[in-house]
Amino acid sequence: TEDSEIASIVEKYGTSVVKRPVELATDETLLDTVIYDAMLQKEKQAFDEYDIVITIQPSSPLLKTETLDKAIEKFADFNIDSVISVVDDKNLRWGFDDENGRYFPFYSERLYRDLLPKTFKETGGILATRRNFVTETSRLGLNIDLIEISREESVEINTYEDWWIANNYLNKIKIAFVVDAYDQIGTGHMYRCLSMASKLVFHDVVFFINRTHQLGIDIIEGYNYKYQTYGGKSELLGLFEQFDPKIIINDVGNTSYEYMVDLTNKGYYIINSEEIGRAHV
């Protein structure tokens, strides 16, 4: 950066700052040129050359470290020169011919989105390349691989709307619904939880259903919610450790006391809808 205030802020967080020359801080400056200059400065300080140069940007704040790891791992294949992060972008697209003043389709046949050929859009999150392909005008080699990321990770902040979207993702709460439906208890528990889940669309909701109760599985498959099945308490607790929910909502009618103690000891916030179990006391 050429900005002393930005440099001061990031240095407080332990970040090494590369001073950007003022002549490379214009709106017309290519990012390739900026990265090339920063790379040369760092190599001069280190008295060494890098093997791989990776560009990640603060405008893509939802990028996960494991995604960055996957991008780096791709370079184990020495045929790969560069790796770019992309997101699925299948759509019917149009262009505009300035010379003729006419719009034209980028597709040959109108199809449902699911039937369109796979196309991708660069996210701006990751652009990694081998050192020998980094120049003042390019950061791409000859053999380019793509790493497809989730729509959440692909959020790039360029507008206030993008900021709002990123903020909603960052404020998402993981919520687990433990619920069943079978002949003896009916379907009311399931539909009650589905009703609650419909008001939690901005959060990460997962249903946990006993795999021996096919009725509950059939119902949840009719809705667009994630779900996992389990066979017993220990397996369910293991799934919770993987998902790491902030809130667990139990609606099975007869929750065991021992199960509730296990959840409490692990620090989960618990909501119960009980009918006959001890855990409602």
Q: Each predicted region: which residue ranges?
A:
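Short internal beta-strands
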Residues: 1, 85-86, 204-212
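A short, glycine/small-residue-rich beta-strand->loop->alpha-helix junction that serves as a flexible
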Residues: 181-192, 215-216
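Short phosphate-binding loop-to-helix
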Residues: 5-54, 62-70, 232-243, 254-255
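Short amphipathic alpha-helix
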Residues: 190-200
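Conserved small/polar residues in nucleotide/adenosyl-binding loops
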Residues: 279-281
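Nucleotide-activated donor-dependent transferases that construct or modify glycoconjugates
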Residues: 172-184
